[in-house]
């Protein structure tokens, strides 16, 4: 399955990002927002939301893992704009191309590896009526922590490999 392969290819990103995003989600829990981890091509890899006891989706439209939010697939949206600009963005209501998102707000911020290559983004989406003025700032802080941990782990893996090669040789 294509989605399983993408998730496996991005397993380290998901594993590192999820705890930071779960912490961030605690501040957004009552606002019916959801948080998605997205690869560099706009494919949703992982989603965090509170389904609680409600049968209704957390926001007005379903977003599931495997959904593609590239500019070509979905028009202007928080994910596609963030990935193309490689900058944090907010997309309000009718700024979305698709009318079904006109009652929504998206906050998205890119994730870069230690070499500053774009590897994906994180998107927070929810009802426009529940606009949260600090959401993008909190997201950027979480992304900063995720990037630092990714860099640390990547550097540690290289050093461990070099040390292993040195001790074996």
Specify the residue positions occupied by each region the protein language model found.
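Intrinsically disordered, low-complexity terminal regulatory regions
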Residues: 1-63, 69, 90, 119-169
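Fold-independent oxyanion-binding glycine-rich loops
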Residues: 40, 85, 93-95, 109, ...
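A short beta-strand signature within small-molecule sensing/ligand-binding domains used
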Residues: 100-110
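Flexible loop/coil segments at beta-strand boundaries within sensory signal-transduction domains
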Residues: 112-117
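Soluble sensory domains of the PAS superfamily and closely related sensory modules
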Residues: 75-89
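Membrane-proximal, non-catalytic sensory/regulatory domains of signal-transducing membrane proteins
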Residues: 89-101
